[in-house]
Amino acid sequence: MVIGLGNEFRRDDGAGPAVVARLRGRVPPGVELVLTDGEPTRLIEAWTGAALAVVVDAVRADQPQPGRMHRFVLDRPLTGTTRTASSHGFGLDDAVRLALTLDRMPGRLVVHAVEAADLSQGQGLTPLVAAAVDDLARAVLSDVRDAGPPA
């Protein structure tokens, strides 16, 4: 399963949905592509029961380098200098905390993130984030293929 997390109407927060759009028709049979705004219960509902969930998101960093990509394998909430770019106050960190409490984590959770430049209202990714979309899609596809066919 690949989950594009974000809001296409908040500039670079649309990176996750943009990657999912690039993956349409390219993922192996049985791999589900999902879009969500990052609300924790919707994320948990999407990945519950999945052997592998790959989440694609935009992040804010304390010392940002827009377009820089990160990959995390999560079994606990994110810490440090990156934060999800949720436009409504909740996001991936909250979903992981809640899923751990409820024992509803996927078998493996991989996050591919890109550092955002602009999270203001508006459509369209900034040039540096847009330039990272193809590389993110390739990285996600590699993780999905390495995991083998969905159960």
Language-model features, listed with the residues they occupy:
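N-terminal catalytic or cofactor-binding beta/alpha core of small enzyme domains
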Residues: 1-116, 123-134, 139-151
